[in-house]
Amino acid sequence: IRTLDDGGFYMANRISFPTLQNLVSHYMMDADGLAQRLSRPCSRANIPITSGLSYKDEWEIDRTTIQLQRKLGQGNFGEVWAGVWNGTTAVAVKTLKPDTMEVKDFVQEAQVMKKIHHPNLLQLYAVCTIGEPIYIVTELMKYGSMLEYLKHGEGKNITLHQMVDMSAQIASGMTYLEAHSYIHRDLAARNILVGEGNVCKVADFGLARVIKEDIYNPREGTKFPIKWTAPEAALYNRFTIKSDVWSFGVLISEIVTHGRMPYPGMTNRQVLEAVDRGYRMPCPEGCPDPLYKIMLSCWKHEPDDRPTFESLKNLLEDYYVSAAEGSYREPAPR
């Protein structure tokens, strides 16, 4: 549900309501382009209260207040654990592997994350930078990685409507990064976390940086996943928010195929060469043409021809209304 400048409310651009009650009443009586009529309110999620738990400043906490309980996964630079903070708050804890990354780079990740506040971006709670290993403490998402959720969890049975909604949530989080001149550089299902009610949050900002220049050139030697990386980024190290848009198109393909590896049967080198020649993944089985067109728009060769995350968010949020009216249009370059 979105708001108008004059205080009105809307879910689709073509119709708005003066009050929230009017909107809810309308969609309870008539789906009017939504996947189904509204029935009952969503249950309110329990959000941990984390203020006042630090001992030094707003972000630094004593590592003795963290109890690691269960290993959730392992990434390039460390492990992720489920744990408890102060004996009361369930958290996720990311630890730094010794000698795999400069401590200052890991701390810089926290400096980026603590400035980010959006419902679809993973929230930082605290850091432990005194002693080793360094901890980054974040909210804990019930279902963990979207990739595992789609392949092995309850996500194996999600509907197309849920797939579109999850894609829209990710686009919403990336719209925030876009507006604040951040890039992610590793946008993929493995770096999306899923919680109650299929709430999706973009995670792993280890490669994210504030962009002062229009283009960010990564340090030589850093590895990036070819099958998710835009050609100008993979070939020339030119990373922008528009290379994230390319990755988002690949991410949608992961969602609609329940976590299938992109470009099945092709090696990284084959993908890089084929994409540079103009090859694009074909429409996945069962994927509606309008959704595939959105994916193709993300894979335009020229970065400036790709849509913004804001336009992608709006397209996906209005997807069923537009499809019902036959009014889908490929997003215009901005």
From Swiss-Prot:
Reply yes or no: does the keyword Lipid biosynthesis apply: no
Q: Which residues cross the membrane?
A: none
Gene3D superfamilies recorded for this chain?
Phosphorylase Kinase, domain 1, SH2 domain, Transferase(Phosphotransferase) domain 1
Q: Name one GO molecular function term.
A: non-membrane spanning protein tyrosine kinase activity
Q: Where is the active site?
A: D186 (proton acceptor)
Q: What is its EC number?
A: 2.7.10.2
What InterPro entries does its record include? Kinase-like_dom_sf (IPR011009), Non-receptor_tyrosine_kinases (IPR050198), Prot_kinase_dom (IPR000719), Protein_kinase_ATP_BS (IPR017441), Ser-Thr/Tyr_kinase_cat_dom (IPR001245), SH2 (IPR000980), SH2_dom_sf (IPR036860), Tyr_kinase_AS (IPR008266)
Domain (SH2) ranges? 1-42
Annotated localization: Cytoplasm
Q: Which domain of life is it from?
A: Eukaryota
Identify the residues that the record assigns to the Protein kinase domain, covering every copy: 66-321
Q: Which family does it belong to?
A: Belongs to the protein kinase superfamily. Tyr protein kinase family.
- Protein name per Swiss-Prot or TrEMBL: Tyrosine-protein kinase SRK3
Q: Which organism is it from?
A: Spongilla lacustris (Freshwater sponge)
